[in-house]
From Swiss-Prot:
This is Plasminogen. Keywords: Blood coagulation, Cleavage on pair of basic residues, Disulfide bond, Fibrinolysis, Glycoprotein, Hemostasis, Hydrolase, Kringle, Phosphoprotein, Protease, Repeat, Secreted, Serine protease, Signal, Tissue remodeling, Zymogen. GO terms for molecular function: serine-type endopeptidase activity; signaling receptor binding. Pfam families: Kringle, PAN_1, Trypsin. Belongs to the peptidase S1 family. Plasminogen subfamily. Its EC number is 3.4.21.7. It catalyses: Preferential cleavage: Lys-|-Xaa > Arg-|-Xaa, higher selectivity than trypsin. Converts fibrin into soluble products. One of its GO terms (biological process) is proteolysis. The gene is PLG. It is found in: Secreted.
Length: 810
């Protein structure tokens, strides 16, 4: 390595990332760094701030944070790897990717990670040190090479990669073992691949992930923030052997991409277990028998079952021998069986027995809590520090991160540090006295948000340990000063913050100087007087600059407008139980699914249906095959028991039947007279036209169907089911191509939970922010609650236009 002894006269230094400066940064909303080396600057945009960071010479700028309401930019030498991250309002943290990454691109010229040992384990010498070796590359002479501490670097563009001088007097320098970043190649099965290849192995152009044309799909980027579903780049969000994409060819739904394997060893896979933790992706035990006692087939063999879950396709999943494993993100470890009649089964793995203290702050797999956000609106008193409800959804609809988890956001708001705050599960809480309950989110790019909760009016009771949950008071409808959604269109006269501080006039510059939110710069925002407004569309609602010199801005406490009853669909007045079982499952709380109806012939229940307006019920077309005369049918609304009907049920005749004209399994029934909308009889919401339910969304089915002898026969039962993307559901192992794009799958692949005979035509509803949406009509399945055979439902969003046309014209 003689050239390292030479003073290089010229280096071709290419900055990573050209064009938009922000492409080189990772962003996190609501995050701030506790930095000791920083500069505060006044700028008008995040792009300006990025330029300032790039041009800084007095220190290496690794991050910056931007405060939009202050128009303030803070550039910093630290990042989240070197200093604590704090929760803060009105701030976005931007961190340079190159300083967060512990992998190298190409030869590692721009590697800025923290590896400080060589391949043989020798400790690196500091670049600024003179002993034991006098360096030719020093921080002073090479300020752009990132020669920090004793970290491995490649200041001379060595093709063999990063290196360092060593602390061994006998060894002047050695190369370091730095893994390759997965933007030019892939490790394992490519689930962390973040490159920009956007064509399939046959050369087809990839369809953008945020598009539903030409192929509708459930891999929606906003629902999978950790999967990096950007642009139309090849990705692997569902555990396939390698990255893939939907294609722009209407005749080819999806195809694998040709991504080369990285030549360096893969990154550590994290802790492994001899017992079941989470979904068992890290299980490395030696159980080799399925739940029914069948012996497992060896992963490397193709007999009796041919498959692609091979050690070659999943090199990081330890597919040794015939041991049960979970290489592709199934609910639990499984294996192919040696029985030619049974392709595969799950295995029975003992649960890990460990105390919470052993796992809660580790990077162990996180068990995501079940959906708990109540649809019956809870409220909180004061600033919500006494709130003890079960809401776990933020104001923008994001799911909350469990308080004991450090993924995706590391934090100090733990049950140990705040023992009196009741930091249970992932429920919204207010441990630090903020303006209302909040939580960390499961979106890596959004650290925290306030929760989708209302403040109690004077007559309401909050969700506390001693008080029952109450429905938001109807008296709120008399409020004249109220907001819709985030209040961007609010034009009321509220002029004090939630803390009671008077607002500063928008045209004033005292006590706070500002230029971005003034009547002149925002003429359409109606910035009159000192009234609360939301000119920037802040998710937390209207705000104002305050007259307190120590408080730049704060939010205003303005109630939400009460929706008219016609817009109140999908909101039962009794909170659903939301249990995870149907066949062998649980009995629903009476009238908690008030849109569920019973279709009857000759007094007998035979199918379910869903009330979508006072005069109209949606059901399955196959339920109406035997008799075309609508007078044969009766619709029972508000029932909980199948046979012993309550006195206040409504029984309606059917005057008209409408079958979908292209023979889809969906139909509309017009009732003989409008149903009276009550707490027990209430319509579900229709989805937006062509809306796609995201893969793994938790939805609910209800019905009086066959229960296989389980408890609750004759009573309305419910089940929680995950939606399964059609691409997955149509695998050979499951429904083998039978599911059409106008249908959706939902169910537990382990079996035991499903809709069944008598449930046909009934609803599959999915919770969205604050209400239930009718996304599916129970249609068909291969058997009932069978292993690897999920239920199939008509995708209602594909027929919304037809449904609305029929109702409008009849």
């Amino acid at each position: 390595m003689q050239r390292k002894e030479l003073v290089l006269l010229f280096l071709l230094f290419l900055q990573p990332g050209h064009g938009i400066p922000l492409d080189d940064y990772v962003t996190t909303q609501g995050a701030s760094l506790c930095s000791s080396t920083k500069k505060q600057l006044s700028v008008g945009s995040t792009e300006e701030c990025a330029v300032k960071c790039e041009k800084e010479t007095s220190f290496i700028c690794r991050s910056f944070q931007y405060h939009s309401k202050e128009q303030q930019c803070v550039i910093m030498a630290e990042n989240s790897k070197s200093t604590p991250v704090l929760r803060m309002r009105d701030v976005i943290l931007f961190e340079k990717k190159m300083y967060l990454s512990e992998c190298k691109v190409g030869n590692g010229k721009y590697y800025r990670g923290t590896v400080s040992k060589t391949k043989t384990g020798l400790t690196c010498q500091k670049w600024s040190a003179e002993t034991p070796h006098k360096p030719r590359f020093s921080p002073d002479e090479n300020p752009s090479e990132g020669l920090d501490q004793n970290y491995c670097r490649n200041p001379d563009n060595d093709p063999k990669g990063p290196w360092c001088y060593t602390m061994d007097p006998e060894v002047r320098y050695e190369y370091c073992e730095i893994i390759q970043c997965e933007d030019e190649c892939m490790h394992c099965s490519g689930q962390n691949y973040v490159g920009k290849i956007s064509r399939t192995m046959s050369g087809l152009e990839c369809q953008p992930w945020d598009s539903q044309i030409p192929h509708p799909h459930g891999f929606i980027p906003s629902k999978f923030p950790s999967k990096n579903l950007k642009m139309n780049y090849c990705r692997n969000p569902d555990g396939e052997p390698r990255p893939w994409c939907f294609t722009m060819d209407r005749n080819k739904r999806w195809e694998y991409c040709d991504i080369p394997r990285c030549t360096t060893p893969p990154p550590p896979s994290g802790p492994t277990y001899q017992c079941l933790m989470g979904n068992g992706e890290h299980y490395q035990g030696n159980v080799a028998v399925t739940v029914s006692g069948l012996t497992c087939q060896r992963w490397g063999e193709q007999s009796p079952h041919r498959h692609d879950r091979t050690p070659e396709n999943y090199p990081c999943k330890n597919l040794d021998e015939n041991y049960c494993r979970n290489p592709d993100g199934e609910p639990a470890p499984w294996c192919f069986t040696t029985n030619s009649s049974v392709r595969w089964e799950f295995c029975k793995i003992p649960d890990c027995v460990s105390s919470a203290s052993e796992t809660e702050h580790s990077d162990a797999p996180v068990i995501v809590p079940p959906e708990q956000t109540p649809v019956v609106q809870e409220c909180y008193q004061g600033n919500g520090q006494t709130y003890r409800g079960t809401s776990s959804t933020t104001i923008t609809g994001k799911k909350c991160q469990p308080w004991t988890s450090m993924r995706p956001h590391r934090h100090s708001k733990t049950p140990e540090n705040y023992p009196d705050a009741d930091l249970t599960m992932n429920y919204c809480r207010n441990p630090d006295g903020d303006k209302g309950p909040w939580c960390y989110t499961t979106d890596p790019s959004v650290r925290w948000e306030f929760c989708n909760l209302k403040k109690c009016s004077g007559t309401e009771m909050s969700a506390t340990n001693s008080s029952p949950v109450q429905v938001s008071s109807a008296s709120e409808s008399s409020e004249q000063d109220c907001i819709i959604d985030n209040g961007k269109g609010y034009r009321g006269t509220k002029a004090t913050t939630g803390a009671g501080t008077p607002c500063q006039a928008w045209a004033a510059q005292e006590p706070h100087r500002h230029s971005i939110f003034t009547p002149e710069t925002n003429p359409r925002a109606d910035l009159q007087e000192n009234y609360c407004r939301n000119p920037d569309g802040d998710a937390n609602g209207p705000w104002c600059y305050t007259t307190n010199p120590r408080k730049l801005f704060d939010y205003c406490d303005i109630p939400h407008c009460v929706s008219p009853s016609s817009a109140d669909c999908g909101k039962p007045k009794v909170e659903p139980k939301k249990c995870p079982g149907r066949v062998g499952g649980c009995v629903a709380h009476p009238h908690s699914w008030p849109w569920q109806v019973s279709l009857r012939r000759f007094g007998q229940h035979f199918c379910g249906g869903t009330l979508i307006s006072p005069e109209w019920v949606v059901t399955a077309a196959h339920c109406l095959e035997k008799f075309s005369n609508p007078a044969i049918y009766k619709v029972v609304l508000g029932a909980h028991q199948e046979t012993r009907l309550e006195r206040d049920v409504q029984i309606k005749g059917v005057t008209k039947m409408f079958l979908e004209p292209y023979r889809a399994d969906i139909a509309l029934l017009k009732l003989s007279s409008p149903a009276i909308i009550t707490d027990k009889d209430h319509p579900a919401c229709l989805p937006n036209s062509n809306y796609m339910v995201a893969d793994r969304s938790l939805c609910y089915i209800t019905g009086w169907g066959e229960t296989k002898g389980t408890y609750g026969a004759g009573l309305l039962k419910e089940a929680q089911l995950p939606v399964i993307e059609n691409k997955v559901c149509n695998r050979q192992s499951f429904l083998n191509g039978r599911v059409r794009s106008t249908e959706l799958c939902a169910g537990h692949l382990a079996g035991g939970v499903d809709s069944c005979q008598g449930d046909s035509g009934g609803p599959l509803v999915c919770f969205e922010k604050d209400r239930y949406i009718l996304q599916g009509v129970t249609s068909w399945g291969l058997g009932c609650a069978r292993l690897t055979r999920p239920g199939v439902y008509v995708r209602v969003s594909r027929y919304v236009s037809w449904l609305q046309d029929v109702m409008r014209n009849n």
